[in-house]
Amino acid sequence: MVTAIIDVPREGLAAVESDATTTERPQRRVVVAEELGYCWGVRRALDIVQDAAGRGGPIAPIGDVIHNPQVVERLRSRGVEGAGSVDEAVGRGFRRVAITAHGMGPHLAEQASSAGVELVDTTCPLVTKVQRLAQKLVRQGYFLVVYGDSYHPEVKSVIAWAGTSKAIAAKKISDLPWNAKRGESGEGKIVPPRKVGVVSQTTKNVDELMKFAMELQSMVVPEGGEFRLCNTICEPTSERQHALKRLVERDHVDLILAIGGKKSSNTARLAEVGNSMGVRSYHIERPEEIEDAWLAEATTVGVTAGASTPDDVIEDVVGALAARGYAPPEGGIRHIDPDYVPAF
């Protein structure tokens, strides 16, 4: 088991003076979620692409390997530079391309083969599992609904692997082409097909998925309809959401900072979880984004981070809070991983 402890200097902590006639303000402090930052799927993707670059030279992921701008910039200095397509990568002189951690449809392998370039696959195995499950549901005759963001590369990849027009991405019922329950009739009524299966983008909020699924189920099951829900939200995403809930309940935080790239879906979900619990929550990429107005009435600040956020960025945010008079978490920020030491 590898334990990495990030120590945050206490320089800049404000001294609080009091006397017999003055009521001390409670100590301002930072608390951190038990689970935050890099997940094993992200670490695996970074390992693969950096190893490939080290062995064979420059490589172009089709998109961002992970959704974190600091990491993408560091990879660029190591010969890993994103491209929008295989054709673009070839035009810029790359002879190797990579599938990002979010996955791609089968067309990318075909394009790479046609262009005569090597293809390196960093797809998270949990995303691959969703892709295969989508294929299975379609083979079994289900209309596939992917709960997620239609623009997200993972969702696009799942629909591409389903290989059918009988698949759609949706985040709310109104995104679907149906507006009535099975068995209902009348002008303008569009009912679901008899069999509907649901999978989820791996980085979604489990509570929101269940609400969506229950509402859709009520539309499908009348008149002998079949509904199947496959909760494919990944364990690291769920762990980070549950850890944040525990932090809010245990430490009575006044403010939450969810750290991660602005493209990071799972970081956005963390901010949503905090706001849903009645705590002001902000999604930030860098410590420079912290606004003094946020801290005006915040005694306890909770910190969490998405699955693609490197340790040093978390450290920088906690350090910025320390410079504003917040006591860092006791013992630093503890990251425990049984089989991996982060590269960044």
Regions found by a protein language model. Give the residues of each.
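The feature marks the mature, well-folded catalytic cores of soluble enzymes
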Residues: 1-344
